[in-house]
Amino acid sequence: METKDGEYTKYNKIGDSDFSWQKDCSESIRNQQNVILSSPTGSGKTKVFLEWAHTQQEKPIIITAPIKALSNQRYRELLDAGYTVGLETGDIKSVPDNCDFICCTQEIYTNKYSELENVTLIMDEFHYIFKNPSRARTYIDALHDSKAKNVLLCSATLGDISKLKEYVNRVSERDFFAYENDSRLTSLFYEGNINSNDIRNSLIVTFSRRNIKNILYSLYSSRKMQDDETLEAIERLAEDDKIDNYEFLNNARKGISGYYGGLLPKEKLFIEKCFEQGMIDTVVGTDALALGVNFPVENVIFTQLAKYHEGPISKNLFEQLAGRAGRKGFFDEGHVYYCNDFAGFCEPWEYDTKDLFGKILEKSNEDVSISLTPNIKNILLDRRTIEEEVEFISKFSTIEVGVDETFGYISDMIDYIKNRAFENKVNRLVCERFGNDYYYDSYTEDEQLNENFEKKEIYRQELLDRKEEFLQNIARVYFDEYSPERNCEIFTEIICGIEPEKILQKYGMSGNFNDMLQFRKYVKSLPKTYRKGLTKINDKIREIDETAIDGFRGSVSVEEISEKLEQEGKLDAKSVMQVLKDQKDMQRMNERADKLKIEEEYELEDC
């Protein structure tokens, strides 16, 4: 192993072992109403912002996160600390009365809680707005619209904090106090190259699924099978969690695993459990690991420092990933390496990993860069005009926005939704049913041909007669995670009475598992009138991975039970009483799950 050869010594960070930065920060922000807290990954930000939150009088304290797994993780941590905690994501809602904390995704806060006034808001992992422009909008809308009494933005190091402060003040019309820290709780050493045979207790970073697979193959070839006791423990856990992926399990038997978006939630949970219990010591993943998935490791190892189409990664992302090394309470220090053994097939050919490693250490952190996407739903709901939306995007994007181009794009989308989308889809539905060959010919003697044409036109008119219903409701059902085209296509099919099973197959079952989960979110967002038959997506998901919906919180929701009874024509007085009983049973199970602190953790974003 090549360590501490002196080449990168000047970049090492010595740990703040006496927690002095936390003490100083707590004193500095104690009496501040609105705070930006910028501090490196692994520096102990959580302790500081929780102390600040407790000095505020407004309850509950709402903590947002960019992905569900992080909300679940925070929820469990606060439960373990003895607080009354609510959890609300796209799949689970459990919010007790008078709770101390509510943990939720950023979208949930923006769409549901931003109007609450006497609350304290903590927006965690705020640096996510720079990683994902399409998701940045929900953060900026929350900052702009939030009526919370106190707000704290918590983030990893972000370039010139004075520029971030100026931007946040402008968006929120608040006066934020900014506190910047560059200290860690444990020392971090930048070491250079590491031999692949020496890799243990590590996060290995790469940027493609293919690279993950190749790295795992290489590690598997060089490692020995673990001892019998560990293998038996892995088998028991796999049986309990219903894991049957042979390649996946075989890697775990040698203490290694990949971690990426294509894994099922139960597989991700299995990896996390194995890691916590010491049965896996090395995880290979993408830069999504920068979002805080909890793998306490001693080493972070880069197999590439440039992406194929984007070039070298940013200094901000590098530090967020490198900061995962040496988590306090697990290791006394952390180490950051690159690995030439893997860089040969991971790094794009035009780059040299050692060269990039040195250059990125010399770089300064990048300043804030935000490019906002349009909020089409706001316009459809008449919350903003097109002109106001363009002004909002132009005002709060940090890069130059082409006003005329943006206005043209949004205008075209709104025109498409209101004037073209329904008719276009109806024409396709007619063709799918009758084909393109039928036309009316007054000279033909083929009566069957003309009869089919008449049927086709009658069917077309029947569908077109439903346009008013489409126009009256598209704003209500518009799903921000889908494109305008997909929103219009699916809702037109629902309005036109296309069989739910066909809609399920086309939009809910044709992609990967994450697409199924996204379609489920869409269905849940629909008014009850339009959900008929589509809630079967829950059963389809459960067949693949029941933990994605249920965790340990019961098998079927009351809402689902009610809808099924109604569909079956059995929603009579006796059935209603049964539903109420099921509701009490469900509440009892959920309370027991909270008490035992066994809430499932699962991540649904693509990693």
Please give the residue ranges for each predicted region.
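Catalytic adenosine-cofactor/nucleotide-binding cores of aminoacyl-tRNA synthetases and other
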Residues: 380
